[in-house]
Amino acid sequence: MDDLSPEEIQLRAHQVTDESLESTRRILGLAIESQDAGIKTITMLDEQGEQLNRIEEGMDQINKDMREAEKTLTELNKCCGLCVCPCNRTKNFESGKNYKATWGDGGDSSPSNVVSKQPSRITNGQPQQTTGAASGGYIKRITNDAREDEMEENLTQVGSILGNLKNMALDMGNEIDAQNQQIQKITEKADTNKNRIDIANTRAKKLIDS
């Protein structure tokens, strides 16, 4: 640089500024693409969470329906003069350890027990903006022109997007953990419902064959 004339130094400064500006534009473009991908992932997780809620509600409804079906079987046994165990069949099933472990004492999942947590920092598909650059700015100004203004703005946006991406990653991790727990709960409910249905089918077959 010592061998360069003032004009050449100025030309080189403008060249570096142009290259730096293009770099910040590319970085901003990549950051926006990453943010868009994150928003789409958040939306998909939200939709998946709603589907899991509907599935779990279906398991709860089957549980309620089976309780009524067991009551009907007990009444039919009485009407047919068949021997009924002293303990109510439904009570016996619902007092079992596996049933209580799955459904709790109430036998139904209250709304508070259904996983409903959704990402909190996304509103209508738009991430909540975080704070931008510090008061000193991101770049050291050389030419002090509109290009450096754009570079500063680009890097400020990148900094904000990176903050949003961090928040989205935390939200996605929490939501995935919650959904994994809900899937495990749904599996347990499905197994318990199947066992309950099998027992009811056996009782119904005995009633038909009697």
From Swiss-Prot:
Record keywords, A-Z: Acetylation, Cell membrane, Coiled coil, Cytoplasmic vesicle, Lipoprotein, Membrane, Palmitate, Phosphoprotein, Protein transport, Repeat, Synapse, Synaptosome, Transport
Which residues in this protein are found as N-acetylmethionine? M1
Q: Which residues form the t-SNARE coiled-coil homology domain?
A: 14-76, 145-207
Compositional bias (Polar residues) at which positions?
109-133
- Subcellular localization, per the record? Cell membrane; Synapse, Synaptosome; Cytoplasmic vesicle membrane
Protein topology in the membrane: Peripheral membrane protein; Lipid-anchor
Specify whether Coiled coil is a keyword of the entry.
yes
Sites where Phosphoserine occurs are at S5, S20, S23, S34, S110, S160
Q: Which organism is it from?
A: Rattus norvegicus
Q: Which InterPro entries match?
A: SNAP-25_dom, T_SNARE_dom
Family of the protein in this entry: Belongs to the SNAP-25 family.
Q: Name the Gene3D superfamilies for this protein.
A: 1.20.5.110
Q: Do you know which CDD domains this protein is assigned to?
A: SNARE_SNAP23C, SNARE_SNAP23N
Q: What is this protein called?
A: Synaptosomal-associated protein 23
> Partners and quaternary state?
Homotetramer (via coiled-coil domain), also forms heterotetramers with STX4 and VAMP3. Found in a complex with VAMP8 and STX1A. Found in a complex with VAMP8 and STX4 in pancreas. Interacts simultaneously with SNAPIN and SYN4. Interacts with STX1A. Interacts with STX12. Interacts tightly to multiple syntaxins and synaptobrevins/VAMPs. Interacts with ZDHHC13 (via ANK repeats). Interacts with ZDHHC17 (via ANK repeats).
Question: What domain of life?
Answer: Eukaryota
- Lipid moiety-binding residues (S-palmitoyl cysteine): C79, C80, C83, C85, C87
Any GO MF annotation of the entry: SNAP receptor activity
Q: What does this protein do?
A: Essential component of the high affinity receptor for the general membrane fusion machinery and an important regulator of transport vesicle docking and fusion.
Q: Name one GO cellular component term.
A: glutamatergic synapse
Query: Where does this protein have coiled-coil stretches?
Result: 23-76
* UniProt region (Disordered), positions on chain: 104-136
